[in-house]
Amino acid sequence: MARKSLIQRERKRDKLEQKYHLIRRSSKKQISKVPSLSDKWEIHGKLQSPPRNSAPIRLHRRCFLTGRPRANYRDFGLSGHVLREMVHACLLPGATRSSW
């Protein structure tokens, strides 16, 4: 289980990303439309003004049960070992164990 502080930090980053999403998107569109290099540098400076944790690249997908940051399945939102345990316990409808 991940430490609770790491999970809270991830939630904080998610809120910041949602807050500054429109500002980042509009700045990136302006950069692509402006022909002169000096104007692009000005807009690039504005793009760097929001906090670093508001960048979407800083977000990390975590298991919603354990908070584990690795081996996550997007379809379920679970890490690999939790997914395996839940499938074995028949807690995920439609998911079957592979056998050949």
Swiss-Prot record:
The keyword RNA-binding applies. The keyword Phosphoprotein does not apply. It is found in: Plastid, Chloroplast. Its main location: plastid. It comes from the Eukaryota. Disulfide bonds: none annotated. Binds 16S rRNA, required for the assembly of 30S particles. This is Small ribosomal subunit protein uS14c. It comes from Illicium oligandrum.
